[in-house]
């Protein structure tokens, strides 16, 4: 699962299968902005979950 780019922002997901959680690191112009934490079930988070979290973040922050 690679980085997602939207309007000058980069969203880089990472996750731990053992702990069943992850985070999406948000960057703007290479500078760290914040971290979006999430939980998931299974071997890896579904791509749709990551997309939904990114879309929600963009909507809430008017990106």
Predicted regions and their residues:
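N-terminal acidic leader/helix
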Residues: 1-39
């Amino acid at each position: 699962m690679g980085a997602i780019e939207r309007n000058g922002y980069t969203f880089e997901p990472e996750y731990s299968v053992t702990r069943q959680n992850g985070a999406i690191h948000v960057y703007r112009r290479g500078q760290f902005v914040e971290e979006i934490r999430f939980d998931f079930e299974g071997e890896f988070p579904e791509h749709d979950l990551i997309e939904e979290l990114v879309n929600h973040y963009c909507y809430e922050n008017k990106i």
